[in-house]
Each structure stands twice: as structure tokens, then as C-alpha cells.
């Protein structure tokens, strides 16, 4: 028995009265709904509701999840527009994208980009999204849109990781576009409205500041500049002199280094390649602008050939994302031991007493011969007591002439209840091959059997991106980390109660100020 006790202490970390968690039921209702039911206990009366509330709040608000936050659809500037060849409106497409559930095996710290490029006829589903390698779709059959024979849908999706939910308000002055081109003329800022010319005015102001330092020559010719909205990120900007009647183009970089020198000296080769691609796109943008001034009718066809769209036609659309992987949490508290005992193990009657006693005897709790005989006789006495309505203090024991104290009888029924009570939480108690079956529960859990305990029955529903038991594990870790930080917190030094002398001085000063009033 000593060896078994030491093994148990090493398993539970020398905790005399541990809290056990048992997954009693786990069901996959559909691809986007997992259900789990857990028994947590035993807890002292009053502790159950404290722990249950904390677990529920942690499950609903402390777990990370993935969601689509921003969408860019080619040729769409707002969510109330429609697309040619697409059955759904843009608003319906955004709502369908919001319902897509994503999961990842590792933490996603940066925003990820996914793409959709489909041509009709056909049905677009979540499985058609080109996702990063680290992100998966829970339900690939999630419906997005239906295309006709002439329908084409090009879409860019931004995926982020977060907690709770995200409410976004669209701002016309901030867009996450990669780049755009603006034709800067002298009187263009004055003719446009204040909102439309906000970015244009900023560019003019920056150019004026550069003129003061002599970096840019003062010329009245219109300049075509290529820049990004981020502003803070460095980019290879170049300026081009465009004559309205001239077809010649002359390019000049801000620095005099060649492309080969820049590529050799650049620390990040991939960044240089991306920037060089932007330069190529800018050349196409310049050609498009000149072609527009010469032949406006052929401008739309040229845009389609270069896969470019006008600035005002494509804008990012924001989605109010929901990151919570746990959709619903319910809990109930059971404070009566006898109620749980009656639900799982029916009350012993005279007819099946011997049958039930054999089941208890084969349970694996190895008691001594005297204890076994005493338990059996006590169960017979309990069945007789249930038939009699009188409340006598002493009862005869099977006609042997001996008297059994009612306290001893209560202890015997309690010891029988120990096995049934702890089998609620641990499946190992029902397994004869387990080392737990050779232990008597009274040795380690005697303090818990003296009074009723709280048992938490916790029900968890997830959206399919995480298992209920994994969600419970992460919520428990978050709570434990929070309380560990609180336990290791240091009290700030406060001289108010440091010594009696400072305390009396402070009280005297407060009293003097009070008298002055």
C-alpha cells in the first residue's frame, strides 16, 4: 500500500485533494460544431460557481482565432454594388466570407493574404480560396457565390488572428492599396473637393518642402509620381517628365546607382524583387495614362490587358470579424452527492441486493476480509432500514444477537459511495488493470467525503477550429497564468502605513486641513 501511495503522490504532484476533470461526452454535430461535456470536481460548496464563471469567461474571451478582416474585389468600391455575371451582391459575398471558419496549427502573428480567381459558370466555395500553407479551411463546402458563363471574380482576402471580435468603421482617407498613381497638376488640388484632394495636397506640400531644400528643380510641367499609401515604408520612387503633346518618356531614379548595384547591396533580396515589380507596374501605369489622353475609347481594354483597374473602382471592404473559436458555454452545479449517486447507481433493493453486491465486490477496491463482510452485512441492514419507518438508534445484525451502531453503518455506506463518487471523474477506476483500482479512496480523499461537494457539469460548443477539450485546456492555462502573475505581484511601497510615526503624522495633517475648512 505504501508503494501505491507513493506512485499516486508522484502522479498528482503531492496534492492530497486534487480536482479531477472528466470528458463524459464528445460529439461532432457537423463540420462547424463540436460539442463536449465535462465533469469538474470535487469542489467545496461555493467554489464551483467561482471556477465555472471564470472558465466560461476565459473560454469565450481569452482564446485566439482566425478570421477574414478585409476583402478587395476587383472593380468594387463599396459593399452595396453588384458584379456582372455574379448572382449574389457584394454584401452577400461579404456575409458569406464572414461565416468561413479557418484554423491554423501554429500562431499567426502577421496578417496573411489569400486569393480567389474564378471564372464562370460555376459555384465558388471556401475550398476555392488559395490559402497560405499554414492555414486551413474547416468546411471547404462553405458557399460563397455563383457565377454565370460571363462572370469573373477576382478577390484578395486579408486574414488576421485575434480575440473576441473586431468592429471596423470604413474610412475614406485610409486604404490598404498596394500602390496608385496620381496626376499632379498645378490647379488640380484647387478644383477637387477637400476629401478627394486630401492625399493630393499632402503630396504637393511634400514637393514644396523639397523645393525649399533644392532637391527638386522648380518646373511648371506636370509630374506623374508613383507612391504608396503607407508613406513610412521606403520605396524606390522615380519621377517622369510627361509632355501632353510629347510621346517621349525619360525616367530618372532618385539616386544614381544602377539596378545591379542596388541588388548587390540590398540585404533582403525578396524585398528588392517586390520593389522592382512595383517599378514595372508603374511603367505600365504611365503608358496607360498616356494612352488615356490619346485614345479614351481604348482605355478600358488596355486596363483589362494589363490587369489594372482605376483607383476609384477598387477599394478595400472591411468585415466585422469574429475570432472566438468557442461559440457557446453552459454549466450546471450539482451540490448533492446522493443525487449523483442515484442517477448512476440505483438504490439497492432486496431483490437485487446480492447481484449489486457482487458488482461492488468485483469493482477492484481490494478491502480486507473483515471489511468485506462488514460491508455486505451493512448493505443488508440498509435494505431493512428502508423498509421500516421507525427511527431506532440501534438495529440487529442478521439475527446474530449483535448490535451495529448507526454511525458505523453510515461509514460503511459512505465507503461504498466513495467508489461510485470517484468513478464519476476517473474512467481508470472502472478498469481492473489500472493501478488505481488497488487503492482505497478513503486513504487519499477522506476529507472530501465528510461534507457535500460541488461538481461542475461544463458544456462547450466550438466552431470546428478547435476541440472542446483543447479549448478547456487553453482556458485553464490562461487562468493559471493570470493567477500566477497575481501571486507573484509585489505590493507597491506605501509610506502611509509603514510605521506608527508616519501614520500619526498623516492623521494629524489631515485633521489640521479639516479644521481650516
Swiss-Prot record:
Catalytic activity, EC: 2.7.7.6
Any one GO molecular-function label of the UniProt entry: DNA-directed RNA polymerase activity
Where does this one sit in the cell? Plastid, Chloroplast
Give the UniProt keywords, A-Z: Chloroplast, DNA-directed RNA polymerase, Nucleotidyltransferase, Plastid, Transcription, Transferase
> Which top EC class is given?
transferase
**Keyword Chloroplast listed:** yes
**Nucleotidyltransferase listed as a keyword:** yes
InterPro entries found in the cross-reference section? DNA-dir_RNA_pol_insert, DNA-dir_RNA_pol_RpoA/D/Rpb3, RBP11-like, RNApol_insert_sf
The Gene Ontology biological process terms listed for this entry are: DNA-templated transcription
Give the SUPFAM superfamilies listed for this entry: Insert subdomain of RNA polymerase alpha subunit (SSF56553), RBP11-like subunits of RNA polymerase (SSF55257)
> What reactions does this protein catalyze?
RNA(n) + a ribonucleoside 5'-triphosphate = RNA(n+1) + diphosphate
Got a GO cellular component term for this one?
A: chloroplast
Relate the assembly described in the record: In plastids the minimal PEP RNA polymerase catalytic core is composed of four subunits: alpha, beta, beta', and beta''. When a (nuclear-encoded) sigma factor is associated with the core the holoenzyme is formed, which can initiate transcription.
**What function does this protein fulfil?**
DNA-dependent RNA polymerase catalyzes the transcription of DNA into RNA using the four ribonucleoside triphosphates as substrates.
Comment, domains: The N-terminal domain is essential for RNAP assembly and basal transcription, whereas the C-terminal domain is involved in interaction with transcriptional regulators and with upstream promoter elements.
Its family remark reads:
Belongs to the RNA polymerase alpha chain family.
Protein name according to UniProt: DNA-directed RNA polymerase subunit alpha
- According to its UniProt entry, this protein's organism is Stigeoclonium helveticum
What is the phylogenetic placement of the source species in the record?
Eukaryota, Viridiplantae, Chlorophyta, core chlorophytes, Chlorophyceae
What gene name is given for the protein in this entry? rpoA
Amino acid at each position: 500500500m505504501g508503494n501505491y501511495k507513493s506512485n499516486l503522490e508522484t502522479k498528482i504532484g503531492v496534492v492530497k485533494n486534487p480536482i479531477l476533470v472528466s470528458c463524459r461526452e464528445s460529439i461532432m454535430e457537423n463540420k462547424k460544431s463540436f460539442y463536449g461535456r465535462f465533469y469538474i470536481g470535487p469542489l467545496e460548496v461555493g467554489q464551483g460557481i467561482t471556477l465555472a464563471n471564470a472558465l466560461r469567461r476565459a473560454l469565450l474571451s481569452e482564446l485566439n482565432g482566425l478570421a477574414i478582416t478585409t476583402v478587395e474585389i476587383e472593380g468594387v468600391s463599396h459593399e452595396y454594388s453588384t458584379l456582372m455575371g455574379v448572382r449574389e451582391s457584394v454584401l452577400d459575398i461579404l456575409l458569406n466570407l464572414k461565416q468561413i471558419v479557418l484554423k491554423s496549427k501554429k500562431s499567426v502573428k502577421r496578417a496573411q493574404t489569400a486569393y480567389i480567381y474564378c471564372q464562370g459558370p460555376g459555384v465558388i466555395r471556401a475550398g476555392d480560396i488559395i490559402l497560405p500553407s499554414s492555414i486551413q479551411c474547416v468546411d471547404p463546402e462553405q458557399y460563397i457565390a455563383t457565377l454565370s458563363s460571363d462572370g469573373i471574380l477576382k478577390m484578395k482576402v486579408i486574414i488576421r488572428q485575434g480575440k473576441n471580435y473586431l468592429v471596423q468603421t470604413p474610412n475614406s482617407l485610409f486604404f490598404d492599396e498596394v500602390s496608385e498613381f496620381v496626376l499632379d497638376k498645378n490647379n488640380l488640388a484647387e478644383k477637387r473637393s477637400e476629401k478627394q484632394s486630401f492625399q493630393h495636397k499632402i503630396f504637393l506640400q511634400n514637393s514644396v518642402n523639397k523645393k525649399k531644400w533644392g532637391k527638386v528643380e522648380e518646373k511648371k510641367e506636370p509630374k506623374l509620381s508613383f507612391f504608396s499609401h503607407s508613406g513610412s515604408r521606403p520605396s524606390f520612387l522615380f519621377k517622369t517628365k510627361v509632355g501632353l503633346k510629347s510621346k517621349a518618356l525619360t525616367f530618372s531614379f532618385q539616386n544614381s546607382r544602377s539596378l545591379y548595384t542596388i541588388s548587390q547591396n540590398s540585404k533582403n533580396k525578396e524585398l528588392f524583387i517586390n520593389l522592382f515589380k512595383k517599378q514595372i507596374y508603374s511603367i505600365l501605369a504611365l503608358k496607360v495614362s498616356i494612352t488615356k489622353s490619346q485614345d479614351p475609347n481604348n482605355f478600358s481594354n488596355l486596363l483589362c490587358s494589363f490587369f489594372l483597374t482605376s483607383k476609384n473602382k477598387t477599394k478595400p471592404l472591411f468585415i466585422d470579424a469574429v475570432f472566438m473559436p468557442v461559440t457557446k458555454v453552459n454549466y450546471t452545479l450539482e451540490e448533492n452527492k446522493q443525487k449523483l449517486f442515484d442517477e448512476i447507481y440505483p438504490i439497492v433493493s432486496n431483490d437485487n441486493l446480492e447481484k449489486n453486491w457482487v458488482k461492488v465486490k468485483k469493482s477492484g477496491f481490494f478491502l480486507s476480509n473483515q471489511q468485506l463482510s462488514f460491508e455486505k452485512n451493512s448493505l443488508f441492514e440498509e435494505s431493512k432500514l428502508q423498509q421500516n419507518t421507525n427511527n431506532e438508534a440501534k438495529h440487529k445484525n442478521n439475527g446474530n444477537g449483535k448490535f451495529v451502531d448507526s454511525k458505523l453503518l453510515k461509514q460503511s455506506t459512505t465507503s461504498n459511495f466513495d467508489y461510485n463518487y470517484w468513478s464519476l471523474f476517473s474512467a481508470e477506476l472502472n478498469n481492473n488493470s489500472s493501478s488505481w483500482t488497488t487503492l482505497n479512496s478513503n486513504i487519499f480523499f477522506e476529507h472530501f467525503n465528510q461534507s457535500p461537494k460541488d461538481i461542475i457539469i461544463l458544456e462547450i460548443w466550438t466552431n470546428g477550429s478547435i476541440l472542446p477539450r483543447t479549448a478547456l485546456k487553453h482556458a485553464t492555462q490562461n487562468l493559471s497564468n493570470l493567477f500566477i502573475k497575481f501571486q507573484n505581484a509585489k505590493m507597491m511601497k506605501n509610506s502611509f502605513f509603514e510605521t506608527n510615526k508616519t501614520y500619526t503624522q498623516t492623521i494629524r495633517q489631515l485633521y489640521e486641513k479639516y479644521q481650516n475648512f
